[in-house]
Amino acid sequence: STSIDMSRISAFALTSYGCNKSKLLSIPFTFENRAHFWNFANSELAPEFLNEPQELGLPVRGIFYGEEGFRHFFTVKPVSGIADFKGLKLRVSNDPVMNGMVEGLGASPTVVSFGELYSALQTGVVDGAEQPIANYKSNAFPEVANNLILDGHTLGAVQAVITDNAWGKLTENQQAAIMEAGADTQAFNADLSETAENKVLEELRSSGCNVVDVDDKAPWQEACAKVISENTSDQAELYQQLLDMKA
């Protein structure tokens, strides 16, 4: 029996259970912008990704997609570009994609749990980390790492899932209502996310956070070329379909 019937999880979380399609959503620089991601989320390809746990025999099913904004690096010392990352200790949660990206930047991946990240930044265990903008601010990371570089390496794709156990107890009408509510929520998230993020970014800028814009993503993409090919070559055709959905 399960204690939770539904959850909102990062799409990447499913890769621990063998969901390889979901992994593609977390590859650096897959989505050029939000419109690119929503083209995917609203496409005929999205249900294939959402249904992957079912195909693998996992006891959960995907309902809809959302996103929590692009993820950016933030550091204790000011950085103005990619060259400044050489030798930095950057916090990772120990997934191979993130490790490979950090190594590609010339930095060293350092595993620290999220709960310990604030003190790790404060005490110099790590020199920086990465999060979506809203998480960066709400966890008070600017207090200890006041430099935010808007590289936007990945878009934080999230999805709602429901257990087979809970789904099986619903009538067909109730199941249809949940899927309909999911579609509405997905559309609401698309409208809300960017507006909310821009507001937080303005607050950060006006409170003295050193926000660095990245006008040219090419050097970043180049630095990630190895980790991108290593993690997409087994699904090259599917990955290309994702890339081709750009707005």
Task: List each model region and its residues.
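Short beta-strand-centered segments that line the small-molecule binding cleft or hinge
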Residues: 39
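N-terminal secretory/targeting leader peptides
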Residues: 1-36, 45, 51-247
